[in-house]
Amino acid sequence: MYQHILLAVPLQRWEEYSPHALAARDAAVAIAKGSGAQLSVLSVYDYDNVSDPGLSAEMAARYREDLMLRTDSEMETKMKAFLAGIQGHDLPITPLLKTGEPRKMILTMIELLHPDLLVIGSHSKRSVLDVILGGTAAYLLRHAPCSVIMVQPKGEKSPPSTTE
């Protein structure tokens, strides 16, 4: 069946994990357990821009460096906590944290890792951010060179199609 599953989840934007990320995680774990596949868990994030005209170039550079270190540390903590929810399943799991634009980085990681399945969560269209991320999910469904499963949390209705 499947040998390598890539689970892509947006951990940066949530204090607590979204129902979409948790549903995708549960589905990826179930499929990996059923097929004996390796599971890679990818979260792509970015750094907030520093754009304060009152800061000197040196201060802005120091602030940005500090922001990057804090963001990296925060993302490592979020990934560990997210993976703690699947400990004890006796699965080979590889956590991956990358910076960049999600759709591009996910496709890059697919090219590097060669998974035979990508698992992503669907996103409801409640905010501009959800529309953007929903666009990422739709893009991956069209462009990923492997099978893709898009998972919705239980009880959530499918959003209207945006590709018609």
Predicted regions and their residues:
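Structural beta-alpha unit
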Residues: 1, 84-118, 155-164
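Small/aliphatic-rich secondary-structure junction motif
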Residues: 1-61
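Short, flexible loop segments at boundaries between secondary-structure elements
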Residues: 146-158
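General small-molecule cofactor/ligand-binding pocket signal
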Residues: 40-42, 94-98, 149
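Short secondary-structure boundary segments
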Residues: 9, 43, 121-123, 152-153
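Acidic, proline/glycine-rich short linear motifs
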Residues: 42-74, 157-164
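Glycine-rich, Arg-bearing micro-motifs that act as flexible, cationic patches
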Residues: 117-139, 157-158
